[in-house]
Amino acid sequence: MNPVPAQREYFLDSIRAWLMLLGIPFHISLIYSSHTWHVNSAESSLWLTLFNDFIHSFRMQVFFVISGYFSYMLFLRYPLKKWWKVRVERVGIPMLTAIPLLTLPQFIMLQYVKGKAESWPGLSLYDKYNTLAWELISHLWFLLVLVVMTTLCVWIFKRIRNNLENSDKTNKKFSMVKLSVIFLCLGIGYAVIRRTIFIVYPPILSNGMFNFIVMQTLFYLPFFILGALAFIFPHLKALFTTPSRGCTLAAALAFVAYLLNQRYGSGDAWMYETESVITMVLGLWMVNVVFSFGHRLLNFQSARVTYFVNASLFIYLVHHPLTLFFGAYITPHITSNWLGFLCGLIFVVGIAIILYEIHLRIPLLKFLFSGKPVVKRENDKAPAR
């Protein structure tokens, strides 16, 4: 069993928090992009569309690598059953809390904003179920995927640990070229699976729960496992934290290919399959870009950084309904897209931080939005000496 390093990986904590918080400008820019969303501005902005595409092309791939890294670290710290329980509680409880408190009111608001409240009774039972699946899971999808991945990794991590006990991990060598070939093959494999499903039974791809539990898990699981391997093998971690011009250039070219596919691809043709191949390798290369950047600039302890690391999940959970409220009721009154984008950031971040501070003072909400039981310090009750 590998010892858990005593030194905290501050840069990984910071990167994970910033990737979470990037969801705020991502969703606000989505309002002003050329992409169709729940709410959109009257005129789209080319630069905000480009900004939105850039964030979307790599953010979650890097996020799941970091999640896999910390998951395996905890896997070595706890017994198997306790590890699964702790991990599922920390992501499952906030997800289940956010559904009635955040995404259900968000869904009701959108029904009236989009004028669909009157047509709801006429929907079939399946359409109601599927609509609720999409709308209630909403931006919480990654928490559901983490629950599924954690359950799958009960077996996967055990196999990895057993294989390590029977082999010499110091002889394991990694190169970005080999990893790129592997992830290219994984992207092609995912594309083949998706195309096969599209040919055999296309309606299942529109099923919300199938999309989240099967397709999203299938795509992001390699990144999750890559994160675990980066924890196990120092050489692999060093490969990601060492700046690489090759990875930076390859990521830039892959992003151009991603944009071209977005602009000229067709959903009825091969756009989604092509995107999966591009974003699979782009995500790998961006792990190097983000990790090396973060390792150089964010590998330090700071009270301010720690605050946002702790607040990032709560802020992400509440930002989505706030963003949609802003888009539905405030965006129409702001003629400038860039001014609207900046106002949206101030509006959403400001209210989210206020709500975060309020919830910290309510023990039940603090538990529900973190999944961590509130521990009372015995020292607080001890008499002064």
UniProtKB/Swiss-Prot annotation:
InterPro entries assigned: Acyl_transf_3_dom, Glucan_succinyl_AcylTrfase, Glucans_biosynth_C
Membrane topology per record: Multi-pass membrane protein
Similarity comment: Belongs to the acyltransferase 3 family. OpgC subfamily.
Pathway membership: Glycan metabolism; osmoregulated periplasmic glucan (OPG) biosynthesis
GO cellular component terms, semicolon-separated: plasma membrane
Function: Necessary for the succinyl substitution of periplasmic glucans. Could catalyze the transfer of succinyl residues from the cytoplasmic side of the membrane to the nascent glucan backbones on the periplasmic side of the membrane.
Taxonomy of the source species: Bacteria, Pseudomonadati, Pseudomonadota, Gammaproteobacteria, Enterobacterales
Membrane spanning residue stretches: 17-37, 60-80, 91-111, 137-157, 173-193, 213-233, 239-259, 274-294, 311-331, 338-358
Protein name: Glucans biosynthesis protein C
EC number: 2.1.-.-
Pfam families hit by this protein: Acyl_transf_3 (PF01757)
GO biological process terms held by the UniProt record: osmoregulated periplasmic glucan biosynthetic process
GO molecular function: succinyltransferase activity; transferase activity, transferring one-carbon groups
Disulfide bonds: none
Keywords: Acyltransferase, Cell membrane, Membrane, Transferase, Transmembrane, Transmembrane helix
Organism per entry: Escherichia coli (strain K12)
Enzyme class: transferase
Compartments, as annotated in UniProt: Cell membrane
